From Swiss-Prot:
It comes from the Bacteria. SUPFAM superfamilies: Concanavalin A-like lectins/glucanases (SSF49899). Keywords: Hydrolase. This is N,N-dimethylformamidase beta subunit. It comes from Alcaligenes sp. The gene is dmfA2. Heterotetramer of two DmfA1 (alpha) and two DmfA2 (beta) subunits. Optimum pH is 6.0-7.0. Optimum temperature is 50-55 degrees Celsius. Stable up to 50 degrees Celsius, inactivated after incubation at 60 degrees Celsius for 30 minutes. Activity decreases below 50 degrees Celsius, with 20% of activity retained at 25 degrees Celsius. It is an enzyme of class 3 (hydrolase). Transmembrane segments: none annotated. Its EC number is 3.5.1.56. Hydrolyzes N,N-dimethylformamide, and to a lesser extent N,N-dimethylacetamide and N,N-diethylacetamide. Has no activity against the substituted amides N-methylformamide, N-ethylformamide, N-ethylformamide and N-methylacetamide or the unsubstituted amides formamide, nicotinamide, acetoamide, benzamide, acetamide and acrylamide. Coiled coil: none annotated. InterPro entries: ConA-like_dom_sf, DMFA2_C.
Length: 762
């Protein structure tokens, strides 16, 4: 496999006529030029049993050559406090206090709080080295003085830490005290922790001005350049209530601080209260408040976890908006990324007449290429076709740069086979700091990834990408639908789930019928509202997918390119820690739609039931398929005919992830069950949501819940909803040169739904 030499991203998922979208590119070297051109994406599957990969080159103003350059990415989350006047670098005595909960105390050097220039060894820093807290000052000539704790830190234990510089005594002091309660730490009160200490060391130098910002959860690499301090030696874990004093605190002061008491308020230079700003809408901001009154406010970089339990959390309240004083922590990770913050390479203003569709900028450098996908909307407030395709951009973000098959312990067991590797997978493994993680990954300290960003290269959001289990997934899989619509001459517009979140049902009401892609798993509450209102008001929907509307997510109100998810028990790669199930971005509870009384069955008719990734089955017709009220759906399909017994995804139309009809979960009672899938292997199993007690007989050969159901129901006001309930359905549309009953059934429904008449009533 060859190395990838170039990659890029754009600033947002979608853009309308007359609007401008920006593109950012980084090559492995600052040398030569790269080529860029606009392409329309049509079919992303190179499976030889299908029509093959398709794209259309589009002449545009962006086409041309651009200087190739390497652009550095700042990886890892931290807080930055600009300090141009050196107010946080006292000339005389000073002290630093904070509460600390380290998740990787033995993982090398980690800056906890610092105003430090690592290049010149100037300033001060409170850090972890070799598992112990260290307080250091440096004079800028290479000379430093340090005091080191004589007790190592325990993992996930809250401590009160105080570092003191006392020039009068020419001394550095360090006070370390565990502040464990019944719920805030890994261990409880019964464990006799030997971790408290008070130590001192000679201070033979004076701290010189570092000429950097103050950083929480990292160290400054060098003096600030263009107003920017690069952060290195990232800290993993939580920090709560950091403070700086312009005096030398004593042991009595440190003891009071460990109890949360106020000491020497006149000498307090800064006090960053991470809970300040929590309100009824959560804490949807990167702003960090200095509660001292001195105006040293800061900003979160790369989205540390907000709404996190603090040093004094007692377990009685689980929602941070109800008890902000116990949620004063930020949880930092060395592998967070919310925006690469590269410099712009070029931009594109959408001209009038450019068709609404799936697009990408194709970039080429040396012998490698990359695609930067985006979606062109019709002119704002208009529809240019009767059909709307919703691109699953929230789910694209959830899976962005996932490494499930290659790194998850159970990845191969879930798939039923060994993973398929390609260049993008190897690149993610080698150069993770370019790309960041998905919400299916864990941070280096084991915490599940709950924030994901569009503003970074997303290597599996590429039209030719094949997922680790060997088939295509998300965007490339959704191109099966785009290709089929083009092949059959249907006129359509495209919008994204981000647009739906912004515009609601008003967006959908412009269209006679709205189509999903193959896997709209992640949705906002507002998106569910939009779908439900649209259908109830007479809209028509085609759910050509499975595992849709499963996880509730939120879009960051200040950074709409960032999405947040908080997961609970279910089909999940991780579960949020106790007390942290509520979104920082709005304070609402996260988890599954089903867990908030809104199972997918209530809107689309079917909901998640099973999954497996070895092969796909086919559908057999149920008695309702012969009901004369749905003859229009079954037209041209014989009563005994198998539906979807061939396809590009797993070899059939019923596979990978499956949804079922279930009246108990809210399937409308007038729903007709037209067909159910069969021939699923033991790799397919009932999802945890339906397992009150694990027991034998839960797999595809044994349990009735392992199936996908094709359903139809009518709604009030002439609406209708058709569901195929399988991720692999779209992969069968082009099977046998588009001459198959999956294509026929889908076309029957779509032709009916675009008519100027109500959907057939059942």
């Amino acid at each position: 496999m060859k190395d990838i030499a170039i990659r890029g991203y754009c600033d947002r998922p979608s853009v309308a006529t007359g609007e401008t979208i920006r593109f950012y590119v980084s090559a492995n070297e600052t040398r030569g030029t790269f080529d860029a051109e606009l392409v329309r994406l049509i079919h992303g599957d190179s499976n030889p049993a299908g029509p093959g990969y398709k794209e259309e080159a589009i002449k545009s103003d962006l086409e041309g050559q651009y200087p190739a350059r390497f652009q550095r990415t700042q990886f890892g989350s931290y807080v930055e406090v600009a300090d141009p006047d050196a107010g946080l670098q006292p000339d005389g005595a000073f002290s630093v206090h904070l509460f600390l909960w380290s998740t990787t105390p033995s993982r090398g050097r980690q800056g906890i709080a610092s105003r430090w220039n690592d290049e010149r060894q100037s300033g001060w820093n409170l850090a972890i080295e070799d598992g112990r807290v260290v307080f250091t000052i440096g004079d800028g000539s290479g000379a430093t003085s340090s005091v080191v704790s004589d007790r190592p830190l325990f993992q996930q234990i809250w401590y009160s830490i105080t570092g003191v510089y006392d020039p009068e005594k020419k001394q550095l002091r360090l006070y370390q005290k565990s502040v464990v309660n019944r719920t805030n730490s890994r261990f409880g009160l019964v464990v006799p922790l030997d971790s408290d200490c008070a130590v001192s060391a000679d201070a033979t130098v004076k701290a010189a001005d570092s000429e950097t910002s103050l950083l929480i959860a990292g160290l400054g690499e060098a003096a600030a350049q263009d107003g920017r301090t690069w952060c290195i030696a990232h800290y993993n874990g939580k920090v709560d209530a950091p403070k700086i004093y312009g005096c030398a605190l004593g042991q009595d002061d440190a003891e009071k601080l460990s109890r949360g008491e106020i000491v020497r308020p006149i000498s307090r230079l800064a006090h960053w209260d991470f809970s300040a700003g929590i309100g009824l809408n959560g804490i949807p901001t990167d702003h960090v408040v200095d509660a001292s009154g001195n105006g040293h406010h800061g900003r979160c970089m790369n989205q540390p976890d907000r709404g996190s339990t603090g040093w004094n959390w007692d377990g009685h309240e689980e929602n941070f908006i109800h008890c902000p004083e116990q949620y004063g922590a930020l949880w930092f990770h060395e592998d967070c990324l919310d925006d690469c913050r590269w410099e712009k390479d070029f931009e594109f203003t959408v001209p009038e007449g450019l068709k609404s569709d799936f697009y990408a900028v194709k970039i080429r450098y040396e012998d490698t290429e990359d695609y930067i996908p985006f979606f062109v909307l019709p002119p704002r407030g208009t529809a240019t076709a009767p059909i709307l395709v919703i691109a699953s951009t929230l789910s694209y973000l959830a899976y962005a740069n996932e490494q499930i098959m290659h790194k998850a312990d159970i990845g191969q067991a879930v798939a039923g086979h060994t993973p398929v590797l390609n260049e993008n997978d190897v690149e993610l493994h080698k150069n993770l700091s370019y790309y960041g993680l998905s919400t299916y990954d864990g941070h280096i300290d084991g915490r599940g990834v709950q924030y994901t960003s569009w503003r970074r290269p997303i290597m599996n959001l590429r039209p030719k990408h094949r997922q680790g289990f060997g088939s295509i997934w998300e965007l490339p899989a959704d191109l099966h639908l785009i290709d089929w619509l083009n092949h059959n001459g249907f006129e359509y517009d495209v919008a994204t789930e981000h647009d739906l979140n912004d515009q609601g049902a008003e967006l959908l009401r412009r269209y006679k019928v709205v189509l999903t892609g193959s896997h709209p798993e992640y949705q906002t509450w507002a998106n569910a509202d939009a779908w439900e209102d649209y259908l109830a008001d007479g809209g028509r929907g085609m759910y050509l997918a499975a595992n849709g509307m499963y996880w509730i997510v939120e879009v960051h109100p200040e950074k709409p390119w960032v999405m947040e998810v908080r997961k609970e028990l279910g089909v999940t790669a991780w579960e949020a820690p106790p007390g942290e199930y509520h979104y920082s971005t709005n304070g609402r509870r996260g988890g599954r739609f089903r867990g908030r009384a809104r199972a997918t069955q209530k809107i689309w008719g079917t909901g998640m039931s099973s999954f497996g990734f070895d092969h796909s089955g086919y559908f057999v017709q149920m008695p309702d398929s012969q009901d004369e009220r749905v003859a229009w759906i079954m037209e041209g399909i014989d009563p005994e005919e198998r539906i979807g017994d061939g396809g590009l995804v797993g070899g059939g139309a019923g596979g990978y992830e499956l949804d079922r009809y279930d009246l108990a979960l809210g399937t409308p009672p007038n729903t007709l069950l037209l067909a159910s899938s069969v021939e699923h292997s033991v790799v397919y199993t009932v999802i945890p949501d339906d397992k009150a007690f694990p027991h034998p007989g839960m797999n595809g050969g044994e349990h009735p819940f392992v199936r996908a159901d094709i359903t139809y129901f009518s709604t009030a006001n002439g609406g209708g909803m058709f569901a195929t309930s399988s991720i692999s359905w779209l992969g069968s549309l082009s099977w046998n040169d588009y001459d198959n009953n999956v294509s026929k059934m889908t076309k029957n429904v779509l032709n009916q739904f675009i008519k100027d008449e109500p959907a057939p009533r059942v």
